[in-house]
Amino acid sequence: MRRVALPWLAALTLFLHAAAAPAPAADRASPPEAQRQASVSRPRLALVIDDLGQNLHRDLRVLQFPGPVALAILPDAPHARALAEKANSAGKTVMLHMPMAPAGGPYAWRPGLPHDALQHRLDEALRAVPHASGLNNHMGSEMTVRQLPMLALMTELQRRHLFFLDSRTNRGTVAAASAQQVGLASLSRDIFLDDDPSPAAVATQFREALALARKQGSVVIIGHPHRSTLALLERELPRLEEAGIDWVDMGQMIATRANRAMAAHGRDGVYR
């Protein structure tokens, strides 16, 4: 798993350095550069689908999405390994959807567990989801508010060259702030598509996500494999280009945000 993740982060580092370097004067006025600048100025969207690995037939619909969707796979799901292998072969981003309290199960991080036990559970979860280049929390409202375990997690992810996405299941989360503190490549979720999985509510959330992307320049969306969510995404994702939205992968979104908090999550780029 480390061998898979390391080239990804190395490429991201090169991307950040390249983006920071000034273009030669002769290139600044060239049509390709003008096109690149226009593309960079377009709003960007990153999409993660959580809770995968439980129903392979259903989850394969996510693999058919026409773009860089990230698949967040539960380590204790019966099809976790098979789906991770298929997603990696399809060129999609594989993520570990790491259970955290109040979630239960053999991999869950829970308050009161010693550091060695937390480390062991992370090791086993990553073995269950091969090719993971990052992780986000599954549930976790009881864990992501605890600074010491979150700092320990982010330090370990930094050592493994993995990124972190804070699902923000608790408004008091310190997970993203801990990632920022140790300099870990990380993001924070902006929109849950389907807290209410009714078709009308999912459609409303998707419109809100596009509006937020246009307002702040980027949006990170998390959805789940509900019928209503999959149906909406199958219909709407092919329309993003026409809508002026660039659908980007997690690495591009991390580079876009450069570990800075959005206004809803912090101040002057620093997480609250």
Task: Please tell me what each predicted stretch does.
Residues 2-4, 8, 12-15, 19-272:
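Catalytic-site microenvironment of enzymes
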